[in-house]
From Swiss-Prot:
Glycans are attached at residues 275, 361. InterPro entries: AB_hydrolase_fold, CarbesteraseB, Carboxylesterase_B_AS, Carboxylesterase_B_CS, Type-B_Carboxylest/Lipase. The keyword Metal-binding does not apply. The gene is Ces2a. It is an enzyme of class 3 (hydrolase). This is Pyrethroid hydrolase Ces2a. It comes from Mus musculus.
Length: 558
């Protein structure tokens, strides 16, 4: 019945109810409130650039107690409940990290960083949902783990809102302890280490308990990350502590076998931290007690030494070395996307590691000394450096070619070969989709040397539709199509464990045909990525090293 034909008093009541409902809906749209198992949180509506839509953002939700005092170098504990409605409209503080590394990289890339504070109290997560999402929506969930060598990074460094809005997905971006506070280990019961990984487990457990309140499906969780974030994802696949906490995994330029991010022993880091801190090194319990008393500034001073810091085999999160766990097929059989970029060590990684000036000065004359040092860093006998020359440099005298081949060698060793190895192990238990991102991004090439192709991390901009710290992307029409395609692949995978759908170029599963997807403005299916290099690193080189050791042993006996 039309309102005009209702009795006067009933018309007033009906109109009042309509106005109330509109007010409540408008209020929820602008300042949505959601429950968690520890209390309520108020978010905000955030308009998504270059779209007509937006998301609800709930920022700085605690998933653990502040890891301070006795909780420094200790497993995370559940957060305390709060009364009233918690404000979730501002970014949380970043975990303690060497800020100078961020600033130097930012200057090189012409990035303007937002003013985000740092604190040891940093175990928070951000949630981005489509505006219609509410309890019962049952949307797929993606949990983003940032990269940064396990020493830098934050939940705010990547703007995930466009992916959430465009693809109707709930996205959670988490933080975890970094550097010494995140990964220092005494190698015994006093401080087993891997605190940052344990923080990630705590965040995934929080998601299982709470994500339904935000419209997410706890039984359809995909974890994804780049670089050290990809290494983290890969490590969760291997960890018994992460069982049942996720159902799909995406590893972008990072897996658990990355050489600088995993170690059998904590000895080197232990001695370095003990020396820098001035704490007694002979007694691990006393050392931890001493380190817990150090100020924020003293911890930051120690952190400055580490460009990267390795996780350790702690017997709990990682029961054995990742290589052993993969070889014995002791991992969670979940569908995976694994990928690398064409030029992994083209620019960003060497600069981050302080190798860019060394590479720029490589000539045929300086090459032997550089390779000898590099072999030592790779934990290879210095005598085998000539094998690296034969495989990558050959007889060329041209400095630019030598430098390019050196960068390729680094990229293969650090990223490509480990990714291929992990993919080959995992495909026996669950589907694996492999990619190589090949596109030279127009929006960043003007700040890089001309030799750089698809550099480490370039694919992330096309997954999220934004670069670091929401840097504006001025994409070409072809790049816009590539962005939409990659967002759709990632979202399809989050929905059903398969990136394919109608209208997209077919992405074959990685089987014994070794097919993979070449991601570019003209995508294509490739076969047997770097097969010769894989053979060199996994068979030829180890065999030659064994022969070298055998001949040295015989010589020693004589």
């Amino acid at each position: 019945m039309p309102l005009a034909r209702l009795p006067g008093w009933l018309c007033v009541v009906a109109c009042g109810l309509l106005l109330l409902l509109q007010h409540v809906h408008g209020q929820d749209s602008a300042s949505p409130i959601r429950n968690t198992h520890r209390g309520q949180v108020r978010g905000s509506f955030v308009h998504v650039k270059d779209t007509k839509s937006g998301v609800h953002a709930f920022l700085g939700i605690p998933f653990a107690k502040p890891p301070v005092g006795l909780l420094r170098f200790a497993p995370p504990e559940d957060p305390e409940p709060w009364s009233g409605v918690r404000d979730g409209t501002s970014q949380p503080a970043m975990c303690l990290q060497p800020d100078i590394m961020n600033l130097e990289d930012a200057k090189e890339m012409n990035l303007i960083l937002p003013p985000i504070s740092m604190s040891e109290d940093c175990l928070y997560l951000n949630i981005y949902t489509p505006t219609h999402a509410q309890e019962g929506s049952n949307l797929p969930v993606m949990v983003w783990i940032h990269g940064g060598g396990l020493v830098v990074g934050s939940a705010s460094m990547n703007d995930v809102s466009k992916l959430a809005a465009t693809e109707e997905i709930v996205i959670v971006a988490i933080q975890y302890r970094l550097g010494v506070l995140g990964f220092f280990s005494t190698g015994d019961q006093h401080a087993r280490g891997n605190w940052g990984y344990l923080d990630q487990v705590a965040a995934l457990r929080w998601v299982q308990k709470n994500i339904a309140y935000f419209g997410g499906n706890r039984d359809r969780v995909t974890i994804f990350g780049v670089s050290a974030g990809g290494t983290s994802v890969s490590s969760h696949i291997l960890s018994p502590m992460s069982k049942g906490l996720f159902h799909g995994a995406i590893m972008q330029s990072g897996v658990a076998l990355l050489p600088d991010l995993i170690s059998d022993t904590s000895e080197v880091v232990y001695k370095t931290v003990a020396n820098l801190s001035g704490c007694e090194a002979t007694d691990s319990e006393a050392l931890i007690h001493c380190l817990r008393a150090k100020s924020k500034q003293e911890i930051l001073a120690i952190n400055q030494v580490f460009k990267m810091i390795p996780a350790v085999v702690d017997g709990e999160f990682l029961p054995k070395h990742p290589q052993e766990l993969l070889t014995s097929m002791d991992f969670h059989p979940v569908p995976s996307i694994i990928g690398v970029n064409t030029d992994e060590c083209g620019w960003g990684v060497p600069m981050f590691m302080g190798l860019d000036h060394i590479i720029k000065n490589i000539t045929r004359e300086t090459l032997p000394a550089v390779l000898k040092n590099t072999a030592a860093r790779m934990m290879l006998p210095p005598e085998c450096s000539h094998l690296l020359v034969e495989e990558y440099m050959g007889d060329t005298e041209d400095p630019e070619t030598l430098q390019a081949q050196f960068r390729e060698m680094l990229g293969d060793f650090m990223f490509v070969i480990p990714a291929l190895q992990v993919a080959h192990f995992q495909r026996s238990q669950a589907p694996v989709y492999f990619y190589e991102f090949q596109h030279l991004s127009s929006f960043i090439k003007h700040v890089r040397p001309s030799h750089v192709k698809a550099d480490h991390g370039d694919d992330v901009a096309f997954v999220f539709g934004s670069y670091l710290w929401d840097m504006n992307l001025d994409l070409t029409e072809e790049e816009e199509l590539l962005k939409r395609m990659m967002m759709k692949y990632w979202a399809n995978f989050a929905r059903n464990g398969n990136p394919n759908s109608e209208g997209l170029p077919s992405w074959p599963v990685l089987d014994h045909d070794e097919q993979y997807l070449q991601l570019d403005t003209q995508p294509a299916v490739g076969r047997a990525l770097k097969a010769r290099r894989l053979q060199f690193w996994t068979k030829t080189l180890p065999q030659k090293i064994q022969e070298l050791k055998g001949s040295q042993d015989k010589h020693a006996e004589l």
